[in-house]
């Protein structure tokens, strides 16, 4: 669809945009109103209008005939006060229009306009540019060399600081003085990131009733500085300070939240943000350019998607317009981020809004050229136009939120309408009827195409279908069978032995920094990472979904390392993951040291094997059982055959991750150890989850954790999978024993020989393999090679007797609705029975 056709089909808004050109486009008015630029009226105590000699002098945004100089003096300006278009580069920085082609590889016809919106670091003449959220950088001429508090802060000398603070009269005077960077001692400490020093100064402020909300000449408070420069721990010291005012704005009308949303870098942004909310922050405050915190969050290069989602959850208005008539959606389109565009549209962003460039977001996306953004916005407009054609456009957002676009209308059924929240029977019938019309039209079109190309025959209709190989282990998911590991043998492993380290078997005892220096090619610059979604948390830290060099990754952010033992844990996991390369292990991309310790790994979209087994919609059969058990055993074998040998020590279904292609991979090596003389002490400690812990380790008498301890854990995961396949639902190990209620009871009973009980109709070969793996005597447990050999033999047995094996599976009641009677001469089959299945089968659904 071209631009002109797009514009011509969009209906007018019910509410016109004040001071902005209105659209004649076809998307509906939304419940949220379009806000024009109305600067926030939040508290701004004692905000001085005196010029402040910083690099962020306030300049009026105006069309210029002569460029603005670095001192903030404009050679010539018109009397009109407007801000310029805000194109976006790949770093998320507002740029001038002259650089739009550089940022987006597309030409720009808009005139270059001087503005105060986010331009620093884009041009080489950085001193002549300043951001509406840029803090003080250039020094003043005054020098407070006699200020002992400033000297202590600069030297990060906590002892000298305490000594000076012990003299309240002098300290109060010095705390109010500015240094050569025109900052108070508190602001200097905030910029330096000195947690203990900040805490001491704040305690002095509180004890002496000093004003924590005191503003400098440009209106900045300590909270502005902290929100822009500090990590989560220091920022929360300010936010938790009694009497802190989170809504004070500076001369550019930016609140601390504007800075926080644009500049905060830590993935732990939820905690400080929640304190902002508790303090009554205005999430819709607009600065002088009309930008809200939601606008600003688009420019956060590290946690932008996390920020956007938090703001939307907190009630941020998605259709607030800045002085250029642009909403946050325009910013996301310029950035070329389909994920951001999707989140904003699903939150109700109106794609028909036209900014000063007279373009809707879809038209703007065509000039930017990002195909994924273009496709998404076109899908949104197409589904709306179709719903409008049947007078049901009020449901367009229901469809968009579930990503039910035109290509999936053919598969809509009653259950899909339930998931869309469409309850009115007349509307449901109308949608189903019109979807059937679309289906018949497609069949007719296909038939005519076949006749034209000679693929059809007279009097008959031939529909071309795409056949996808599926496994019985996935039911209706239509997941392509993984052919890499369905028939692996010991011989193939011998021909491709695992790699080995070049070391002599000893592990370096150097500190973390030296370890990373030795593996410096694994060190990742934190600026190359972006966090997009929190996936979970555990005892060792939090895990986020993110982006690294444009690739989806998982980022494991470790908790602060305060002890030597924690340092050793990180070093071991880093060394192990940096040493091993195997298709059966989660790929390791590298680690970051600052500002947070984190490890960057392959992202496995289906979560852990534990979560896969707990998801009832997944029909896990014997094919999937053999695939998973083979892959996990090959992963453990890779560890056991390494030089020096590695034992996992925490093998369980939660530490087996499943990617989009249904490949099961071993992960989480935080407890893993190289099996060397240096690690004898740690190998004798009880580690791992109790149900998966072998009895010799559970006894706690100092027995070494060996490779056979890992084999025991493999046996317990085998039990989980066998039980899930046969019973059709997940059960926890030992859950059949009513007398076992506590974890320690599992350990006591396992050392007495008690084991989880397999279903009665378990195939004898699988039962024998399970019992070998969990044998009380570790020397009688099989090796990984023996397990693989047995699995290959049992899989061959299954392939030869599929009917017999499948008859052992207990059939659960069908979740599908009963078949509807056929009312037409043409029978149409839909392979999707739910919205989730529709989304999973975009490329696999065929109608015959």
Curated annotation (Swiss-Prot):
Q: Where is the Protein kinase domain?
A: 529-799
Q: Write out the catalytic residues in the record.
A: 650 (proton acceptor)
Q: Where is this region: Disordered?
A: 1-117, 448-478, 810-848
Keyword Kinase on entry: yes
Task: List residue spans for each ANK repeat.
Answer: 181-212, 218-248, 252-285, 289-320, 324-353
Q: Which SUPFAM superfamilies match?
A: Ankyrin repeat (SSF48403), Protein kinase-like (PK-like) (SSF56112), SAM/Pointed domain (SSF47769)
Report the SMART domains cross-referenced here.
ANK, SAM
Reaction(s) catalysed by this chain's protein: L-seryl-[protein] + ATP = O-phospho-L-seryl-[protein] + ADP + H(+); L-threonyl-[protein] + ATP = O-phospho-L-threonyl-[protein] + ADP + H(+)
The SAM domain extends over: 378-441
Q: Which Gene3D superfamilies match?
A: Ankyrin repeat-containing domain, Phosphorylase Kinase, domain 1, Transcription Factor, Ets-1, Transferase(Phosphotransferase) domain 1
Query: Is this entry keyworded Repeat?
Result: yes
Positions binding ATP in this chain are: 535-543, 556
**Low complexity bias located where?**
1-52, 60-85, 95-116, 452-472, 822-848
Q: Which domain of life is it from?
A: Eukaryota
> GO CC annotation: what is one?
cytoplasm
Q: What is its EC number?
A: 2.7.11.1
Q: Identify the CDD domains for this entry.
A: SAM_superfamily, STKc_MAP3K-like
A single MF term (Gene Ontology): protein serine/threonine kinase activity
Q: Name one GO biological process term.
A: signal transduction
Q: Which UniProt keywords apply?
A: ANK repeat, ATP-binding, Kinase, Nucleotide-binding, Repeat, Serine/threonine-protein kinase, Transferase
Tell me which family the UniProt entry assigns to this protein: Belongs to the protein kinase superfamily. TKL Ser/Thr protein kinase family.
Q: Could you identify this protein by its name?
A: Probable serine/threonine-protein kinase DDB_G0278535
Instruction: Output the lineage of the source organism.
Output: Eukaryota, Amoebozoa, Evosea, Eumycetozoa, Dictyostelia
């Amino acid at each position: 669809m071209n631009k002109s056709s797009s514009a011509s089909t969009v209906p007018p808004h019910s509410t016109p945009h004040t001071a902005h050109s209105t659209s004649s486009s076809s998307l509906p008015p939304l419940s949220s109103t379009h806000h024009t630029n109305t600067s926030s009226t939040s508290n701004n105590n004692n905000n001085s209008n005196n010029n402040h000699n910083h690099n962020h002098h306030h300049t009026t945004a105006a069309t210029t005939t002569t460029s603005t100089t670095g001192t903030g003096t404009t050679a010539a300006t018109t009397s009109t006060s407007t801000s310029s278009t805000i194109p976006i580069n790949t770093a998320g920085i507002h740029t001038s229009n002259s650089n739009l082609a550089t940022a987006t590889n597309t030409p720009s016809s808009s005139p270059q306009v001087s503005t105060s919106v986010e331009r620093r670091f884009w041009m080489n003449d950085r001193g002549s540019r300043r951001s509406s959220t840029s803090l003080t950088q250039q020094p003043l001429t005054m020098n407070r060399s006699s200020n002992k508090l400033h000297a202590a802060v600069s030297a990060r000398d906590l002892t000298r600081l305490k000594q000076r603070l012990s003299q309240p009269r002098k300290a109060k005077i010095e705390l109010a003085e500015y240094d050569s960077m025109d900052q108070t001692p508190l602001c200097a400490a905030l910029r330096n990131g000195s947690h203990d020093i900040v805490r001491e100064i704040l305690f002095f402020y509180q004890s002496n009733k000093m004003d924590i909300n005191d503003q400098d000449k440009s209106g900045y408070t300590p909270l502005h500085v902290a929100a822009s420069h500090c990590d989560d721990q220091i920022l929360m010291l300010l936010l938790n300070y009694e009497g802190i005012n989170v809504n004070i704005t500076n001369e550019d009308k930016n609140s601390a939240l504007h800075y926080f949303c644009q500049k905060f870098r830590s993935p732990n942004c939820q905690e400080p943000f929640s304190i902002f909310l508790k303090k009554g922050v205005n999430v819709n405050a607009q600065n002088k350019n009309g930008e809200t915190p939601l606008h600003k969050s688009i420019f956060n290069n590290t946690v932008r998607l996390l920020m956007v989602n938090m703001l939307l959850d907190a009630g941020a208005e998605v259709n607030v317009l800045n002085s250029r008539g642009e909403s946050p959606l325009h910013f996301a389109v310029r950035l070329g981020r389909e994920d951001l565009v999707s989140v904003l549209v699903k939150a109700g962003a109106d794609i028909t809004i036209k900014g000063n460039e007279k373009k809707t977001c879809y038209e703007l996306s065509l000039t930017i050229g990002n195909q994924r953004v273009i496709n998404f916005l076109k899908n949104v407009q197409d589904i709306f136009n179709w719903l409008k054609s049947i007078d049901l456009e009020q449901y367009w957002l229901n469809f968009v939120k579930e990503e039910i676009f035109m290509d999936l209308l053919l598969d809509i059924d009653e259950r899909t309408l339930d998931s869309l929240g469409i309850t009115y029977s007349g509307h449901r019938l109308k949608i189903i009827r019109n979807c059937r019309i679309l289906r018949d039209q497609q069949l007719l079109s296909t038939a005519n195409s076949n006749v034209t190309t000679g693929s059809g025959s007279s009097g008959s209709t031939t529909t071309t279908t795409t056949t996808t190989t599926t496994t019985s282990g996935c039911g209706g998911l239509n997941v392509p069978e993984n052919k890499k590991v369905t028939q692996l043998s010991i011989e193939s492993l011998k021909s491709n032995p695992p790699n080995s380290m070049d070391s002599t078997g000893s592990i370096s005892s150097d500190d973390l920094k030296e370890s990373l220096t030795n593996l410096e090619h694994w060190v990742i610059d934190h600026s190359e990472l972006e966090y997009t979604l929190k996936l979970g948390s555990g005892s060792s830290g939090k895990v986020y979904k993110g982006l690294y060099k444009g690739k989806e990754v998982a980022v494991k952010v470790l908790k602060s390392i305060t002890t030597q033992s924690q340092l050793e844990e990180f070093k071991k996991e880093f060394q192990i993951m940096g040493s091993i390369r195997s298709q059966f292990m989660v790929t390791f991309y590298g680690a970051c040291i600052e500002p947070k310790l984190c490890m960057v790994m392959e992202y496995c979209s289906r979560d852990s094997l534990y979560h896969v087994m707990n998801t009832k919609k997944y029909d896990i059969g014997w094919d999937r059982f053999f695939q998973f058990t083979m892959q996990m055993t090959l992963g453990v074998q890779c560890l056991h055959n390494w030089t020096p040998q590695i034992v996992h020590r925490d093998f369980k279904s939660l530490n087996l991750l499943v990617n989009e292609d249904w490949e099961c991979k071993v992960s989480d090596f935080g407890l893993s150890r190289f099996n060397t003389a240096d690690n004898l002490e740690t190998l004798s400690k009880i580690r791992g989850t109790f149900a998966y812990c072998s009895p010799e380790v559970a006894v706690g008498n100092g027995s070494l954790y060996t490779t056979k301890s890992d084999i025991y854990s493999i046996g317990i995961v085998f039990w989980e999978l066998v039980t899930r396949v046969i019973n059709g639902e997940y059960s926890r190990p030992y859950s059949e024993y009513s007398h076992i209620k506590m974890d320690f009871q599992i350990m006591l009973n396992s050392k007495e020989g008690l084991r989880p009980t397999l279903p009665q109709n378990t195939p004898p070969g699988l039962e024998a393999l399970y019992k070998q793996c969990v044998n009380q005597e570790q020397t009688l447990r099989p090796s990984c090679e023996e397990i693989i050999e047995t699995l290959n033999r049992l899989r061959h047995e299954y392939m030869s007797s599929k009917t017999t094996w499948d008859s052992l599976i207990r059939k659960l009641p069908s979740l599908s609705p009963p078949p509807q009677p056929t009312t037409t001469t043409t029978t149409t089959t839909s392979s999707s029975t739910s919205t989730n299945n529709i989304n999973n089968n975009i490329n696999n659904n065929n109608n015959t």
